[in-house]
């Protein structure tokens, strides 16, 4: 479909499953596997911030196809590799009222025990908040559920 996949490379004759290898390697060394997924932007489909750019039928069709593609991709990640420790959506996952795919029900159905990060409905942990990969010490990134960092809490005392 596009040159951004492993079908175009010589590694394992284009039939390798890099996610399978990653998960198997994690388990081999006693590491709980987590998956990092980016669905907020898609250059091939002209998606920016969960929304197809442009107007008219073509944009609406791309929007619908993008949503279905993302939901199926997340379903595949959640069903092919056994139990996952976490699924991290870079830039978040859209809420059901938004334009983007609704992936939370997929993760909840197929990976009920995995940590989910994040949309306005659910965020099981906090991001440290640094694109440099550094955070202040100590860094406590937990908070009670249900709570989303997009919503205001009832009181500051409820949160670490």
Residue ranges and their predicted role:
Residues 1-160:
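Mature catalytic domains of secreted/periplasmic carbohydrate-active enzymes
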